[in-house]
Amino acid sequence: KNIGLTPSGDDNGFTQKLVIRKSLLNNTSSVAILKDKSGNTDSLVFARDFIPVPHPLMESANADGQLVFAGYGVDIAGGYSDYKDIDVKGKIVVLINGAPPGLISTLTAHFSNAGNKTTTAFTKGAHGVIIINPLSRGGTNLNPAIQSNTALNPGKTIAYGRGFVGNLKTVLNGTAPLLRKIFLNSGKNMEQVLADLKNGKASSFELPYSIAVSYQTTHTDFVSHNILGLIPGSDPVLKNEYVVHSAHLDHLGIGRVVNGDSIYNGAHDNASGVASLLEIARVYRSSGAKPKRSV
């Protein structure tokens, strides 16, 4: 307000109400069953083979579908694509973590992000995603996605969540033992496929298994707030496009209460970011600059 920004939150104020849903996995309910082309089944072992990402919309998640392998799950327009030779509509996509070689560091980070992998799979029509670390052995080596936080839109749809997007039915974290298991009878050599991917050669194909998954999630909703200030754009058309500068207050969320404060406040992450954000806004206003796009 003192800097002179236009309030852009709820009710013409600076604050915007944000509902965040904490989703907690009931790990005793997690079931995943592989089925081969002959109808033979194999029950996977929770934490050794897989751990579900808690579903932010459904307390009882159920999914089944044909497994397809799509490498890193990357699709770059006019460039590298793990999806160009495979149809994943209605299927469960198996991906490995990481990104193809030869990208600049920011793109490597972008395409390695699990949320971006699941978003791409969803846009291609997949019903579910399994992301596997080929080096993980299961158990303590598998990152346990037992709890996740998701920002919800007013209609209780997903605004942002690390893992789920749209109406994906399931997202699982998997292990190297699971990867070896689903490569059996595929006609593909797992080590060779992984080596090809590491060298930038995409490799995508249908696997000889389907999977059925079910698990339970408990939801707890709580309210947080964004602080929104606007500098309107000067161009009558381009003002409808927005440049966003953002920062966050907490460091690693919340934890044990110390002197009445449970927030993990951080100096560099991210008090310096908030200070920088305020300084950017001050410079915009004090310089007399009139950006064409809204900021």
Q: Where are these predicted regions, by residue range?
A:
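Catalytic-core environment of secreted peptidases
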Residues: 1-7, 24-26, 35-38, 85-87, ...
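Noncatalytic luminal/extracellular "stalk/propeptide" segments of secretory-pathway proteins
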Residues: 1-93, 97-100, 219, 223-226
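Protein/peptide-recognition domains central to ubiquitin and immune signaling
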Residues: 1-48, 131-149, 155, 169-170, ...
